[in-house]
Amino acid sequence: MALDVLTVAPLYQGPDINKIRLIAQTTKKSTIPPKALTPARSKLTTIETKRIMSVLDETIHKVELVSLLSHAASESKTSEGMLGPDIAKAVREHEDLCQALLDRVSYLQEEERKLQEAEDFEDEAWFRERLFAMDLQKSQLPPLMQEIKESTKNVVRLLLSNPQAASLLQAQTLGRSKEAQCFIDSLVELRGFLFEKLLTSPMEARDKIQFIQDITRRNRRHQEIIDTLENELAACVRNRNAEVEKENFVIQELKNHLHQVLRFSENSLLRTKQEAEKQQKADFRASQARVATVQQEILVLQSQFYNLVMENRDTEQALRKKKYKVETEIENWIQKYDSEMSEKQDEYEELDIIHKEEQLQLEELKKRHDVLVEEFSQIQAEREILTKKRLEDEQEMVRMVRAATLIQALWKGYLVRSMLKSKKKKRGKGKGEKKGKGKGKGKK
């Protein structure tokens, strides 16, 4: 069973009213629109928008006053001199009503908790009686809540009728709870958002939406680039780990081989030692006769050793100097290597910056390439249309030339035939005349 009684007087701050959590919460970071998208207008021009803002400002002012009623009620002596007897009396009555509501709500919550613990006794008479009593208590809450609402309206009306008392009460900002201040901040933020919304024209709203969409697309592209680089980095890390594992495997194999070599050498040394002891025992008896000769050889060798030491002392000094020189050169090479590595690191960072800039230029060139490809496709389509039209014109011209040639040939043939016919007629007439003349001569 749930209690639906916690929605009354959410702005009043009684002794235990802070247990009722406010719904509105301000955001930790305020979103600041870019300067390029700020509204062109700075003041409201229409009556409707001014009325909307005035209603919201009045609401915020009333909320600020109501949120300080608990502080004024807790300091009754100070508030009576600051607000006046009428307002102080109304505030005390409002406090009593709110306290009565909170007491009843806490009592109902406690009874409900006890009934939930005693759910096994639902069929008992006393359980039903207590449940019925709780229902009666709940039925008495709405009238009390209505009285609190009326009392709140009465106190606000008295404060608005006395601007001086309202301003004095509003100055007591330290007495406001965090929840109420959070709600007021939310209302102020809502006012700023609504004010900007009323100042923004539809064209500016569309530009703002377009700007946000562009930013979103740009962030998406950047995220894709970041994902690609992260994948490449992961691949490089995996390759490096694989190489490290291979090297570790080789090192482990070498360690195992070295361990086997050490074991083999120890066994070999032990066998050699045993054989040497046996040989020593055998040779000891044979070497007694050679002791004198060996001692003489030792004396000779000692004298030779002394001579060699004296001869090689200069060589030892030269080798020591050479060793010191080599160590100095090694230190110099190490320092040079460190300096070159630092220079290479700086050069790598510069190349990385250049690479990022070139990536940005590549994105811009891709955009330009897409535009040029589209223009090229349009030009190519126009060229195809012009080529097709030119081919049709050429074919039409060929047909016209062929027709003209055919017409000229037919006309020339007709002229030739007509000339031949006329010549044949002339020849026929000439032959007739010659025959007539021959006959006349014969008669004579």
Swiss-Prot record:
It holds the Pfam family IQ. The keyword Phosphoprotein does not apply. InterPro entries: DRC10, IQ_motif_EF-hand-BS. Residues 421-444 are annotated as: Disordered. The keyword Coiled coil applies. Residues 212-246, 325-397 form a coiled coil. Residues 400-429 form the IQ domain. GO terms for cellular component: cytoplasm; cytoskeleton; motile cilium. It is found in: Cytoplasm, Cytoskeleton, Flagellum axoneme. Keywords: Cell projection, Cilium, Coiled coil, Cytoplasm, Cytoskeleton, Flagellum. Component of the nexin-dynein regulatory complex (N-DRC). Interacts with CFAP52. Component of the nexin-dynein regulatory complex (N-DRC), a key regulator of ciliary/flagellar motility which maintains the alignment and integrity of the distal axoneme and regulates microtubule sliding in motile axonemes. Belongs to the DRC10 family. This is Dynein regulatory complex protein 10. It comes from Bos taurus (Bovine).
